Amino acid sequence: MDHRLLEIIACPVCNGKLWYNQEKQELICKLDNLAFPLRDGIPVLLETEARVLTADESKS
């Protein structure tokens, strides 16, 4: 994931900052507790494709 891209893109729900989770290949919105998948290195920034973070994931 290109870190320059992270400076440009935002959460499609709240327009907040996204954080990259390399291990899970997801972009995380801490404000909405959502994780957006990366497929073949391409962010899928659709609310319908996002998963809700677990309580443990939200804390970290």
UniProtKB/Swiss-Prot annotation:
Pfam families with a match to the protein in the record: Trm112p
Record-annotated disulphide pairs: none
Protein name (database record): UPF0434 protein YcaR
CC per GO annotation: cytosol
Sequence similarity: Belongs to the UPF0434 family.
UniProt organism field: Escherichia coli O139:H28 (strain E24377A / ETEC)
